[in-house]
Design a protein with these regions (language model features):
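Active-site beta->alpha loop and helix N-cap motifs at the rims of alpha/beta catalytic domains
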Residues: 2-148
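C-terminal alpha-helical cap/extension of soluble enzyme domains
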Residues: 4-13, 37-38, 214-303
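Catalytic alpha/beta core domains of metabolic enzymes, predominantly
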Residues: 130-134, 141-251
């Protein structure tokens, strides 16, 4: 039986080559480094530029990661797409490869859809994948998707599929919303904060951890707070994490993360993003890195 996930996971940034094709070799190396820092892999998350990748590219990248020996029990790939058949195909592939979970956006192009419609969408995926090892972690990110997952919808899905719908990533940025989920006390339902900003509060409320963009660059420190959230140092650890995150959030997040990886890996290829995103300009890269270095920041072992 597949174990439910907890801890710190990273929506791994996706490297691109000169022709803007995904670069599997660089992605594999990055995933190996992240695993060495004790964080799991939420590939094809928002910060992975997932919705700038085709279904075929995602399927191939999953295959390449697994072929390289990346531990699938530490993987929660994002599989939610706008088109039902694509969500089914990607989810089924992830399950067949042995991924411990899938992080699933609702179909997000059409706005103002009802809970009935969203329930039907998730239910269709579950019924069509038809695999008892499927574990879905819902992905609530209304600032980006503009299609939210309500508490009532979560309740309906858990009631209908208690062994399949097992958790959620709350990227609403609204602690009251995350706390409302925790207060429902759903049986072994794993609530992940969408940023380490809320990690300490989430753990104190009975949460499972966090799935955070800045785990791409600060994984060990975030994991340390997850491991030591009950210690007397937890408050200071949280403050230290917030300082690094604030430095990164002063810039567009995905280009900033890639610029940071590029600098500390000594590999400028990492700065590439797919349109419509644009790479961080040189002057902003320099300012970001200088800000991080002034705080004693490093990414040991990356290069």
């Amino acid at each position: 039986m597949t174990e439910r996930m907890s801890g710190v996971l990273c929506p791994v940034v996706t490297p691109f080559d000169d022709d803007l094709n995904p670069d599997p070799a660089r992605l594999i190396r990055q995933c190996e480094w992240l695993l060495s820092q004790n964080v799991g892999l939420a590939v094809f998350g928002t910060n992975s530029e997932a919705n700038s990748l085709s279904l075929e590219e995602k399927l191939l990248l999953l295959d390449r990661l697994v072929d390289a020996g990346i531990d699938t029990t530490r993987m929660m790939p994002g599989t939610g797409c706008c088109a039902l058949p694509e969500t089914v195909a990607l989810t089924k592939h992830a399950v067949n490869l042995g991924c411990a979970g899938t992080l699933m956006l609702p179909p997000f192009y059409y706005k103002g859809v009802s809970d009935d419609g969203l329930f039907a969408s998730f239910a269709e995926v579950i019924e069509r994948v038809a695999d008892t090892s499927l574990h879905i972690y819902l992905y609530h990110i209304p600032p980006i998707s503009q299609v939210g997952i309500s508490l009532d919808l979560i309740e309906r899905l858990i009631t209908a599929y208690p062994d399949t719908v097992v958790g959620i990533k709350d990227s609403s940025g609204d602690w009251d919303n995350t706390n409302a989920m925790l207060e429902r006390r759903w049986d072994d339902f794993r609530v992940f904060a969408g940023a380490e900003t809320f990690l300490l509060r989430n753990m104190r409320g009975g949460g499972a951890g966090c799935i955070s963009a800045t785990a791409n660059i600060n994984p060990a420190a975030i994991d340390r707070l997850y491991q030591e959230w009950q210690s007397g140092e937890a408050g200071e650890l949280q403050k230290d994490l917030d300082v690094i995150r604030d430095s990164t959030m002063a810039y567009p997040m995905i280009p900033a993360l890639k610029a940071t990886v590029a600098h500390f890996s000594n590999d400028q290829q990492w700065r590439r993003v797919r349109p419509p995103l644009v790479a961080l300009p040189d002057d902003q890269c320099s300012a970001l890195i200088e800000s991080l270095l002034q705080k004693g920041f490093d990414m040991p072992g990356l290069n």
